[in-house]
Regions:
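Short, Lys/Arg-enriched N-terminal segments with co-localized hydrophobic residues
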Residues: 1-23
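Core AdoMet radical
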Residues: 22-99, 112-116, 141-147
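Surface-exposed cleft-lining segments at the edges of enzyme active sites
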Residues: 82-90, 114-124, 162-171
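Flexible glycine/acidic-rich beta-alpha junction loops that bind and position SAM and/or redox cofactors
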Residues: 84-86, 141-168, 196-210
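Conserved C-terminal portion of the radical SAM core fold
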Residues: 98-156, 183-198
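A C-terminal junction/extension of Radical SAM enzymes
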Residues: 171-240
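Local cysteine-cluster metal-coordination motifs and their immediate loop/turn environment
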Residues: 245, 249-264
Length: 265
């Protein structure tokens, strides 16, 4: 494909200059869900590529994705907890995966869809829930994370009478991390598991420590990989490239109302 460096307003005002050249812009939807907030559609033309992260591959979203098929990578979030007290207004994993199959049938490239099991609760029950998604998924490229138990998340869990997975701690115990590593080691070695900011899970043969925006994404979008750099850090151990730019402006929980959401509002 023909690649153009561009200077525009809005999203692209964040272009940075390295060595006299403008960096590319890869838009991403981490601050909300693009199946609810469609404001991202007005920004696609100002991006070189877009990574959509959604818990609901709805028919309306599929229609929009197909309009920008050459620019989009889809992360279809599917934890297996949809429709439960933890994700009360999220579609079930069966429905979400059926919608992924519908998108594939519409002609969207399989190599630009990742099933995002984000988060996983590393308990026996939590790993069983994640395994159901893995077994049923038509896509065997996954991005995974463990649940971050922020204080406000623990408070929500208590209000909903959900057992705290790590007691009063933020992250899993070493025993829980070990259980998850053993679970990953038992997976089909042909499956791909990507992690970002999860150093406890890196190092296994089928696990790649790779940013949510990475040179792998750049190549899948047929963009040049020479003039990209790491540095899109959002937190400790983040591996994202500096060309990552948020497309949504929500700073509160969306209407899916997930109990583990990092937004306090």
């Amino acid at each position: 494909s023909i690649y153009k460096w561009r200077i525009t307003n809005s999203v692209c005002k964040s272009h940075q200059i390295y060595g006299g050249m403008l960096t590319m812009i890869i838009g991403i939807t981490e601050s909300g869900d693009p199946s609810i907030d469609f404001s991202w559609t007005s920004k696609v033309d100002n991006c070189d590529g877009v990574i959509l992260i959604t818990k609901n591959v709805s028919d309306k979203l599929i229609s929009q994705i197909m309009k920008y098929i050459d620019k989009i990578i889809l992360h279809a979030t599917c934890t297996g907890m949809g429709g439960t007290i933890i994700e009360p207004y999220v579609p079930t994993y069966e429905h979400q995966l059926a919608q992924v199959s519908k998108l594939l049938a519409a002609g969207f490239p399989k190599d630009r869809i990742i099933v995002r099991i984000d988060p996983i609760i590393p308990t026996t029950e939590g790993l069983h829930t994640a395994q159901k998604v893995i077994d049923a998924s038509p896509i065997k490229h996954f991005r995974i994370s463990v649940l971050d138990a922020y204080p406000h998340v623990r408070s929500r869990f208590k209000t909903l009478n959900i057992p705290l997975p790590y007691d009063e701690k933020f992250q899993p115990s070493e025993e829980q991390f070990h259980m998850m590593r053993m679970w990953l080691a038992r997976q089909n070695m042909n499956y791909i598991f990507d992690v970002c900011a999860e150093p406890h899970l890196a190092g296994l043969p089928n696990v790649r420590a790779i940013g949510c925006v990475s040179d792998d994404d750049i190549m899948r979008l047929n963009l040049p990989v020479n003039n990209i750099s790491i540095g899109g850090y959002q937190r400790k151990d983040c591996l994202c490239l500096s060309c990552k730019h948020e497309l949504l402006s929500n700073k509160k929980r969306c209407s899916y109302n997930c109990a583990y959401c990092y937004w306090k509002g």
